[in-house]
Amino acid sequence: MSERLNNGQMLPRLQLPAIGGGELHLPDALTGKYGVVLIYRGHWCPFCNEQIAAFVEAFPTLSEKGIMVAAFSTDREEVTREFVEKHRIPFPVGHSADVDEVVQSIGAYEMTFPTRGRFLESTGFVLAPDGTVINAVYSSRAIGRLVPSDVIRLVAFMEGLKAQATANAEP
């Protein structure tokens, strides 16, 4: 098992095929704004469907507050495309993630089910505009994951700290 990421560490670079063509480069795709990276178990997971649906619903508010979102899983391109269409996902979604690469680079939990094969457990990161981790949520099973309202509140809190530090630094 590799080590999990701590607050303040840079999210390691990941490159995944993206729905719609091209590649999803993380954290680069989110650099310059606060970012959310959602690793979901798969299109078949009801908890993942709920989480993604919540981020889709909150996407206008997240965008207004300068928060970008990206998601990925080990699902094949075809089922990921159907998943994106089903939820009308407006943010970048990667597919066909390599379990070993993701486990080694960011420390996500993995699981193998006879009916589902090998996949990544739900993992979420809130990133600062420079790509460093502000918050990491590692789940070892289906529950325990980022929710949009917490992300919005955390970013507001971080912005408040930054404003306070700036005010205290002024002569």
List each language-model region with its residue ranges.
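Chalcogenol-based redox active-site neighborhoods
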Residues: 1-171
